[in-house]
Amino acid sequence: MSIDVNNESGTEVDEQAILDIARYALARMRIHPLSELSVIVVDAEAMEQLHIQWMDLPGPTDVMSFPMDELRPPSKDEEEAPQGLLGDIVLCPEVAAKQGAEAPTEHSMDEELQLLTVHGVLHLLGYDHEEPDEKAEMFGLQAAIVDGWRAEKGLTGPSPAPTVS
């Protein structure tokens, strides 16, 4: 799996954890091991510009996903998805820090960025949360992936509760 993490935000973030949880999420979703993903960490100003440009919404947001090859998880009878370029995930640590502090289970900026990385990966794979059934499926997968990764890493305490809707 080729995953690049590029921190352009000026904020210190745990890039290794972002890389690790992205790799875990893609493996868990059975994405081809030679697929490519880019994660860019930007400041609030850059995120606001992207949010306006692509969503026509004011203010910065927490995570945006830009799919490339529209890869999907393989069906039950397929071994793995075809190789391809997944796309880009853009994260904003300033928004993540605020959301983590305000979440039902308060958690750190880095924990929020890990959750948002999984959220972004799922969006790249075609998952969405516009409808209640879609939201239940996506957030269920998101929680299972974050919980599995935390267990594998030996992290204790409650997993971060979703702050994106």
Swiss-Prot record:
Protein name as annotated: Endoribonuclease YbeY
Gene Ontology biological process terms, A to Z: rRNA processing
Cofactor details (free text): Binds 1 zinc ion.
UniProt organism field: Streptomyces coelicolor (strain ATCC BAA-471 / A3(2) / M145)
Function: Single strand-specific metallo-endoribonuclease involved in late-stage 70S ribosome quality control and in maturation of the 3' terminus of the 16S rRNA.
Binding site for Zn(2+): H119, H123, H129
Keywords assigned: Cytoplasm, Endonuclease, Hydrolase, Metal-binding, Nuclease, Ribosome biogenesis, rRNA processing, Zinc
Domain of life: Bacteria
Main location per the UniProt record: cytoplasm
Any GO MF annotation of the entry: RNA endonuclease activity
Subcellular locations according to the entry: Cytoplasm
Pfam families assigned: YbeY
Cofactor requirements of the protein: Zn(2+)
Gene3D superfamilies in the record: Metalloproteases ('zincins'), catalytic domain
